[in-house]
């Protein structure tokens, strides 16, 4: 399998200004400014192997590649009049994943690892069963601690599409047909 996560990350970085900001054309003609920050820390192979041993899993190669580039990131936090008001995608560092896993009640019926947070209420999850079965479609969205929905993607495809969609929830687009789109507005 080819691995292009580094190209996606470097491509996004090349579009950022010196403060890490980017202006993007968004839905319905809006132009918005966002902040993108990548952790300067990198997870070492030893860090990854220790994490894997502790949680009895092998992290997918594309996700490992990202973590060796940046041990965490915040992508498309909204800037309003130059002030960061949050939002976007937070990709956790290995240490932040450990912190999230302390909320055992939230994840008790899920055999997954939370690797990020987005849309103010959703966790991005690596499904351990899918990984153990060798299924490349191992990413899930865990919404509000209630719904565990497959994205049918791996990490690098998710990250690539998330950036291409300017942080919009592209996985929901199929529901917004011309017929029903305007009912939600």
Swiss-Prot record:
Gene3D superfamilies xref list: SMI1/KNR4-like (3.40.1580.10)
Domain of life: Bacteria
UniProt-listed SUPFAM superfamilies: SMI1/KNR4-like
Name of this chain's protein: Uncharacterized protein YobM
Record organism: Bacillus subtilis (strain 168)
Gene encoding the protein: yobM
